[in-house]
Amino acid sequence: GVGGFHRAHEAAYLDRLMRRRAGSGPGGGAAAAAGGSCLEWGICGVGLLPGDARMRDVLAAQDHLYTLLLKHPGGLRDPAVIGSIHNYLFAPDDPEAVLALLSAPTTRIVSLTVTEGGYNVDDATGMFRTEAPGAVHDAEHPGEPTTAFGYIVEALRRRREAGIPALTVMSCDNLPGNGKVARTAVVSQAAMSDPELADWIDGNVAFPSCMVDRITPRTTRADVAELRRALGVEDAWPVVCEPFTQWVIEDDFPAGRPPWEEVGVQMVDDVVPYELMKLRLLNASHQGLAHWGRLLGMEYAHEAAADEDISSWVRAYLEREARATLRSVPGIDLDDYISTL
């Protein structure tokens, strides 16, 4: 999925890396000399749903470029043109083109941004919903998939038959253990039609978990108009987001990966401590803002954040209660993290 969050997060990180390695960013010359060009990496977006046709049309008209507009406190705007997406395939137009792309040796990572509910996994049981219409269709017609997992399974079947190494499937959705959830979805979809293939996938495909963070509200007409008025930029679908961003990834990429750590991504052995930190500090404080603000008759989050009483309650929760439940998190100063929040 190539929605707002993907374009504000993964695509933005890769764009920064490409610019750095090309010598146009801070330290770019030294980085390029040390590691060579990073322009071998790029993103080809894939849209599966009928509504994704508009993204196809907008990106094609703009040579797959778009504006990322960071909104700072106080109203400062910080725009950047993102160029890491080099193509976009709308699956209903040409399913075979998508399968050919996923099956190609040059494709080494398939990232997923399909929302928390897009994995067809039951929250209560952790089991794949084999009765879902899309799953049933893709099991009965594996060569004509309609779901993300049907496409991935068919592509992996082709790679296996052609002797092409397996790739990495990386979930970038905001749910705990997203790599495990992605593994469940892909392996279970394969098992519905080819148990032997499912075993091969389970043993050969990497499914690293990662923690993602960047508030990215839906782009409005007002955002488009503001960009046009303030900067003279005509962008049919810019992305607006907060300045803060974080990405923590389990370093399990047998087929290779971009050197994301050069642009602030934390590559770790285990993402769980970072997930707990985010859930208990960031997510819980957001929930506190919402509940306390609502009880005090406020309508918007920024009103709650500006209230001195609520701010003191949130800080007390973070420093006195939540922090005590967390062990040390590698590479993170929890006091600094709390201050940032």
PLM feature spans:
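Substrate/ligand-engaging "lid" and interaction regions
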Residues: 1-341
